[in-house]
């Protein structure tokens, strides 16, 4: 049955995991902050302190184990309420909600986190807008059996435009809060991994 086990259970076992990574000699550790843990519905005025406390502890533990935290701000987890209420990134209101989230996080971890990724595989939404950008007409009765079919090319490009505006705002805001921040988006390849024939760079 789906979700019948705990997977790696990182939420409860991250201290053990980070000790193992330290033993392996890692000098950085990439993880994600779930937007919905900080703003459960996504459009609240005030953040969820319990959610922030988890990331306080996680980031401190990464640093304690001698690793540089590399934080992804969005990794395919747009809060469900934003999808249901606004259609996800189709709505320009998402830019305002996103700004509140990233400002909260940048201020909270100023001086602790230097390396930031805005959107994981930001260009993946062109192929899979529902997963990558939370784009869905979830309440459209015409598509009750397959809501993904309701997504039009215009929806996709509108959402992508809003995400790119939010991405630019993230870079600007992050540098305003801490000029030492290094911020960029993660890109995905064409969908097919390719590897060289051998390790010779020529």
Regions picked out by a protein language model, each given a short descriptive name:
Residues 1-14, 18, 22-27, 39-202:
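Non-catalytic scaffold segments within catalytic domains of secreted glycoside hydrolases
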Residues 33-37:
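Active-site gating/metal-coordination segments in enzymes
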